[in-house]
């Protein structure tokens, strides 16, 4: 095996592009070797995160999820899709390769969200305050419940989910599409599994895609 993005891997990648062009074939590629996005360049700072309650106390940490079905050189933690800076750092790893890529490479593909248990990001509280006008930290007990017990709690749950949905759209779906286009390619996105209004996320991509 050639480790992902290694010089040997890149040599085979450019050979593949050359042969595909000779044969009249098109190529799309993912930004990784498995799903969701992530890999060896993702540190704990950029990795998917979660909140949980331990003995009634709100705590945060990593989900610990790794890239599924990763090929050699692509193993590692899953990206925090709610963090724009994390995505920017991750995508920068592909700039040198894609700047040298050429036709018939057509599209860059996000092979589904599926970041299980990722329900927190460091910008959650300030983003929640900006979007909803009140401090979620004063209502953390609501997040410890499986379901709301009042209209007020229903509203807090709704505001929390809307905030996470907004962060995913603004900090990943739209930046992914814009970045791919800026590199000269078409964006493809599988949005299923996302904790959002799926139509909004699919609309952000050039090619919205589902599994079949």
Named regions from a protein language model:
Residues 3-160, 165-170:
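Mature extracytoplasmic enzyme cores
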Residues 18, 178, 200:
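Surface-exposed charge patches
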Residues 173:
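Regulatory input/activation interfaces that engage signals or partners
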Residues 72-80, 181, 207-212:
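Acidic/glycine-enriched edge-of-secondary-structure segments
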Residues 24-28, 103-107, 177-179, 184-188, ...:
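Beta-sheet entry/capping signal
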Residues 36-41, 109, 183-212:
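Hydrophobic targeting/anchoring helices
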């Amino acid at each position: 095996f050639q480790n992902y993005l290694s010089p040997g891997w890149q040599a085979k990648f450019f050979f593949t592009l050359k042969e595909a062009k000779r044969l009249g074939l098109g190529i799309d590629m993912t930004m990784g070797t498995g799903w969701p996005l992530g890999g060896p360049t993702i540190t704990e700072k950029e990795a998917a995160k979660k909140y949980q309650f331990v003995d009634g106390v709100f705590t945060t940490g990593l989900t610990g999820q790794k890239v599924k079905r990763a090929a050699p050189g692509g193993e590692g933690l899953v990206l925090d899709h709610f963090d724009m800076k994390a995505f920017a750092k991750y995508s920068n790893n592909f700039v040198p390769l894609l700047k040298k890529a050429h036709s018939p490479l057509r599209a860059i593909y996000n092979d589904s969200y599926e970041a299980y248990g990722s329900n927190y990001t460091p910008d959650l509280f300030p983003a929640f305050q900006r979007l909803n006008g009140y401090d979620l930290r004063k209502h953390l007990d609501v997040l410890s419940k499986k379901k709301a017990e009042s209209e007020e709690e229903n509203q807090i749950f709704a505001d929390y989910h809307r905030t996470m949905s907004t962060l995913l759209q603004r900090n990943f779906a739209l930046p992914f599409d814009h970045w791919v286009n800026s590199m000269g390619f078409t964006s493809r996105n599988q949005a299923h599994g996302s904790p959002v209004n799926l139509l909004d996320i699919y609309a952000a991509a050039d090619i919205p895609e589902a599994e079949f």
